[in-house]
């Protein structure tokens, strides 16, 4: 019995110790011992033996939960490891796919360039063979004629043979001249082929911009046509309302004249009293009619101006051009004015009708001559009303005329096309920007072409292309600026662009020694990629950061070291800052001047050598003919 109790006590001690170690961890290892656990268990046994079984159950539950948590932690660790492995595999697959795509694009571009070069070479070879064949046929004819002349006696047909030989000699010289011109044209065409490629790219971009502008103009025109239709509909409604107002005014005037005739008021007095300078000392019974007629003439002067047929026709003629434009003003106020005029005329008509009824009786046929006299007397005042113009019409007309300016898109586009034709007619020189990554090539190009600087530019992938026109020695010079990527994986692409370059802008960072040390590698790459010596401008960029780095005791590249390295390779040298724009244009101008000078020298040497070779050939032909 005692052994069982002791064994159970030891088991409980182990359970308690294991549970507390799992819960407390390192703190249990540092401070909790088995003796303390046994002491705690003995105290519980002595104080309250009934708590032993619940205590043991609690300990077992603790152990079970600890095991479950440890199992879950292991599962989570396994899952995290699997996810990391999967992500690494996917990343490697993406890198391989990107490299494959880059390689495929590079191979395709190489094949295209090779195919184009082979086609051009085949055409030149075919032309050369054709011309050589023609010359050989001519030579054979000459030899044949010489043999015939030897066989024939010297006395027979000497004059004819000399003439024939002279003609053949002239023809031979003409053919040689044409051959020289053809070879010269081929050389010029070959030099202009690159310019035409760049021109094609520019024209495609310009055509896309023109299509976008035309699309915008089409949308604007459709919206303007819709607005014109709305304005024409409103104009027709206004003309209809004017016709109604005219008929209402005629009826109102006739009834007014009749009522005045009933009250034994003369037309002259009525008109004089209705004028702005009416007599304030008139009799009291006529005060109502004078005030009514004066207010009527003041409120309806606008409608009277539109009731006259001539004035209405002039108004319609003047409004025809305005219907083709949108003034940009709302027409809601016009509708409100029309409704107010209709309401006023309706009220005046009712007031006049009530006045006529209060006076009693209708106008007789004998009143017609008086009415005619009144109309004749009132023609002057009506004519003045018919020539009425609203205040501010001149100002509004000037505003509308100033806002209705002709659309200058076509003229601007024509000017742009003319300027483009002027630019593209010149030779374009290809300048390649090279250097390590993050030396500021893209910022340099943006400052040169757009006069802008962005501090958060992204890395160039592959090659970027810009055009820039500069005045070099008083002449417009077109530059094709190719911004190459500086990363290691894009070096092969950059090297391929050196092959047809006319000049190189080799940039390094004055605050980064590694970019300066890699300049030698870039120069070797340029020399390997070109079949001739081209000008190189060594540019120390980010010169504005040198003072800051010197203040922080960081190593920078001095201008003396850059100039010394440039002298070693026979290159130009300049320090620039794309941030503040210092020496950016000057560096490109110096390089463009050197490129232009060297290209002109090469062209002159090629033409001279070509002329010399043709003269040697002609001399050999003459010697052959004379022999």
From Swiss-Prot:
Localization in the cell: Cytoplasm, Perinuclear region
GO MF, one example: GTP binding
UniProt keyword Nucleotide-binding, yes or no: yes
Keyword annotations: Coiled coil, Cytoplasm, GTP-binding, Nucleotide-binding, Phosphoprotein
One cellular component term from this protein's GO annotations in UniProt: perinuclear region of cytoplasm
Function comment: Binds predominantly GDP, and also GTP. Acts as a dynein adapter protein that activates dynein-mediated transport and dynein-dynactin motility on microtubules.
Entry similarity comment: Belongs to the small GTPase superfamily. Rab family.
Name of protein: Ras and EF-hand domain-containing protein homolog
